[in-house]
Amino acid sequence: MRIVLLGAPGAGKGTVAKSLTEFDGSVQISTGDILRNAVKAGSELGKEAKGYMERGELVPDKLIMDIMEVRMKEPDCQKGFLLDGFPRTIPQAEALKKLLEKIGIKLDAVINLDVPTDVILDRLTTRRTCSNPDCQEIYNIKSKPPKPDGTCFKCGSPAVQRADETEEAIKQRLATYNEKTAPLIDFYKKEDLLVTVKSLDSKEIASEIIKAVKK
């Protein structure tokens, strides 16, 4: 399947994407991952992106799209892909549309994960992340706590609350999402690609998405 996953921070895009990749071998693609991988590989595009990232600047859309094109042409994308958290803005959505037309790929659906704000706040304020950059296992102090001493089961490093997952920071991230990304819902509705899913259970959501794509 070839889909875009939309949803506010904490809507569960990553968890749902994982369930879907296990279903049909589609690969999960996020801009953060492809930028980091391009930098690590030392490609010309990666070197260019590294400059922006080291200065703490946003990587321009044109450069992101060039790196995205390289990624989508890789063999593992032939089975399908799940774009997790991209596009984020209307200009990015328009650029993605042009890119897909250029490389002859059609999206099956754009999935909007509609999760209430109070659920998102609860999920993210209770989330803890392993502080080891090579591990970064995700925990939740309610549903999947780390060890009793607050360390990671996998590597033993402290599991900490990220600075952008305090209540104040989350509210700011949600406000940014509503301003910049929510307009994509109307964009993809007009493209006749939008499927809105309201369930909170990741397996149930994955099942609904699979049914929608098969129609």
Predicted regions and their residues:
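Glycine-rich phosphate-binding loop of ATP-dependent small-molecule kinases
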Residues: 1-215
